[in-house]
Amino acid sequence: RATGDVHLYGKEINDETYAICKSDMMIKGNNPENIRVGSTLSTDEFAGTTFDFMLSTPPYGKSWSSEQKYIKDGKDVIDPRFKITLKNYWGVEEDADAIPRSSDGQLLFLMEMVNKMKPKHQSHSGSRIASVHNGSSLFTGDAGGGESNIRRYIIENDLLEAIIQMPNNLFYNTGITTYIWLLS
């Protein structure tokens, strides 16, 4: 049980789910204004805000091509949430492509949360993330491509705590294998 104040925040694209969440927040005495409706990828409703704990189940295989114009302008990444720096072979830092294929945005949702992590010097324990994914976040993308660079960034910055494979049939009416990514 939490000993301090707990403030809940969230964003939901589905209007019905948004309404249920907002009403649930009111019933339980939480601030319903902290729940926003819309696309997490196209607008950063909580820009500049960091969180202690973050949970998500990004949509599996959801195309984000309709939101590409908010994230990338041609070859340039324009949204700072999705910009990363990696070291090359000689140890020189370089900007790297961190944009996955437009047919699956799961890793973009993960990078959104990584962007909202508290630095360890700001909080005694930093932040913790639990995000439920299917296998594509682990296995897709070519070396040097967006998916590979995101995974590399997470590992090189020592953010990955564990990836837990869950039993099949965890979600109703599907046999998709799921994994929980734990970051801190």
Question: What are these model-derived regions, one by one?
Answer:
Residues 1-56, 60-76, 107, 134-136, ...:
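Conserved S-adenosyl-L-methionine
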Residues 24, 75-99, 109:
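Surface-exposed acidic, glycine/proline-enriched linker/cap segments
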Residues 55-56, 77, 97, 164:
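Compositionally biased, intrinsically disordered/low-complexity regions enriched for serine, proline
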Residues 69-84, 122-130, 154:
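A glycine-rich, aromatic-flanked flexible loop/lid motif
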Residues 91-183:
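Conserved Class I SAM-dependent methyltransferase catalytic core
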